[in-house]
């Protein structure tokens, strides 16, 4: 193919100029020629970088929107810092949006201890260990305790290494795992510094309870079969964000390895926005600790290397190529580079794209929407002008929480899956769904009642009898202006029973708990 501009004639590979599946933009040196790519080019992965306001996100939105509407290629966006992809629902009405940290909008119900479909436990246990290590620094012996606790917990719930989630192993959640971690630690009998490290591990795990406080888990295939956005902006803790991202990426990799056939044609696109949130997970790293950022970088490198043959393209997006590391930059074949001003960033990109000196200097002077494109079908980077897709297609920069809560549909036919605990099945008021506002209130009331009446070393069952004999009055005493109801009381009982089971030394038979709740 040939493109002619003012005084330049260039030869290009086929299916690039005024052709291709996806149009990237207009060649800067041509008044009319457009450059495009084929779908399968994306299986070799893509890097999109640029400073805020340079057009990076607008381009990403346009790419994803066209992939779904024109080619029925589903995408998954993992968005750690902003809420800019939610507005795609204006163009894609069945867009799935999940908002961990803002469960009142669209809960992200994820139980990391449930293996993805058709993934054997033996494989998945290593996934769990890698994901936690990529997000949380684990001093020795914490890493060994964690590994042993994983083995013990699955064993306690009657799993075998050959089982998948369809077999008969019992489902457990983060509270069960913390209890198993504590028991494993106590059985080993560490002393001194090792004992303090183990206690710190329990505290660290308890900080994750609100993230994974459920037994059901959204199937990985649900996230891959339709356009999906997972927003993490409401989670303030960077380690927690990194953990969710690590668990998601590794669960996807395990699922794809077990369920996809490697024929190479594009099936899915995964966009990891603000990738440095995962790759910079270095908080509280001490001497002798496994460095989470190194593990996370290796995780992403492994995914980039393994998943392409299954037709899954990964797009890594960030403001700075320096923050995603040169090795990740090197593993993405296609590069779309908007305005960059920092010297190291420009140097990394220039080296990776075979730029000449003029092109490198030009990076800092690019206007919004202008970018350099480079991949294996080009001999040198091409400067392109990308369309202002959001304005052209009436897609807002973002939408309010209220707007999104009214538009999302994922949970409409799955309301019963929002019940967090097995004990909820005993409550007659909760057969079809779970009222989130009531659950939050009941959980806090149960916490207050527990703190005032129980302690960790308590073993006297008579205390439980005394508390439950006056549970209605105790619940009413903790209300502010909220209305008391039998529905609320039943929910308080569920949360209080769970606190007793996991927070005291009182052994309680499950039958007693279930009988108590059935009377609610």
Regions found by a protein language model. Name each.
Residues 1-18:
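An aromatic-glycine-centered, glycine-rich loop/turn in mixed alpha/beta architecture
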């Amino acid at each position: 193919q040939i493109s002619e501009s003012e005084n330049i004639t260039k030869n290009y590979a086929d299916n690039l100029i005024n052709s291709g599946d996806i149009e990237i933009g207009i060649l800067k040196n041509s008044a009319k020629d457009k450059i495009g790519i084929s779908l399968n080019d994306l299986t070799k992965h893509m890097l999109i970088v640029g400073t805020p306001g340079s057009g990076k996100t607008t381009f990403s939105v346009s790419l994803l929107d066209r992939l779904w509407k024109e080619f029925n290629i589903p995408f998954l966006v993992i968005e750690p810092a902003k809420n800019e992809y939610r507005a795609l629902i204006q163009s894609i009405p069945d867009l799935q949006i999940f908002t961990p940290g803002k469960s009142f909008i669209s809960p992200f119900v994820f139980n990391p201890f449930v293996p993805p479909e058709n993934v054997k436990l033996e494989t998945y246990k290593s996934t769990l260990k890698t994901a936690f290590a990529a997000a949380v620094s684990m001093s020795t012996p914490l890493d060994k305790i964690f590994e042993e606790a994983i083995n013990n917990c699955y064993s306690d719930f009657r799993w075998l290494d050959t089982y998948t989630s369809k077999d008969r192993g019992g489902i457990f959640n983060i509270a069960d795992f913390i209890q198993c971690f504590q028991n494993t630690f106590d059985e080993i009998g560490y002393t001194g510094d090792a004992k303090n490290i183990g206690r710190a591990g329990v505290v660290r795990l308890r900080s994750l309870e609100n993230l994974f406080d459920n037994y059901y888990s959204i199937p990985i295939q649900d996230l891959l079969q339709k356009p999906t956005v997972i927003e993490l902006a409401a989670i303030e803790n960077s380690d927690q964000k990194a953990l969710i991202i690590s668990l998601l990426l590794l669960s996807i990799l395990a699922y794809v390895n077990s369920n996809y056939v490697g024929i190479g044609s594009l099936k899915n696109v995964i966009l990891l926005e603000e990738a440095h949130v995962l790759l910079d997970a270095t908080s509280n790293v001490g001497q002798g600790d496994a460095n989470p950022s190194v593990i996370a970088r290796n995780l992403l490198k492994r995914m980039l290397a393994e998943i392409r043959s299954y037709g899954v393209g990964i797009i890594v997006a960030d403001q700075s190529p320096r923050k995603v590391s040169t090795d990740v930059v090197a593993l993405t074949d296609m590069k779309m580079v908007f305005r960059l001003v920092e010297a190291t960033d420009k140097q990394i990109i220039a080296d990776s794209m075979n730029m000449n000196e003029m092109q490198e200097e030009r990076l800092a002077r690019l206007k919004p929407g202008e970018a350099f494109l480079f991949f294996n079908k080009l001999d040198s980077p091409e400067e392109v002008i990308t369309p202002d897709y959001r304005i052209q297609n009436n897609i807002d920069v973002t939408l309010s929480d209220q707007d999104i809560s009214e538009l999302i549909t994922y949970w409409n036919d799955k309301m019963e899956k929002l019940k967090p605990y097995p004990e909820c099945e005993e409550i007659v008021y909760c057969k079809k769904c779970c009222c989130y506002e009531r659950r939050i209130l009941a959980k806090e009331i149960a916490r207050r009642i527990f703190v005032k009446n129980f302690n960790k070393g308590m073993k006297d069952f008579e205390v439980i009898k005394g508390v439950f004999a006056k549970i209605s009055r105790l619940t009413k005493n903790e209300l502010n202006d909220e209305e008391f109801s039998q529905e609320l009381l039943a929910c308080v009982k569920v949360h209080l029973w769970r606190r007793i089971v996991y927070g005291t030394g009182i052994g309680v038979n499950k039958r007693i708990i279930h009988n108590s709740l059935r009377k609610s």
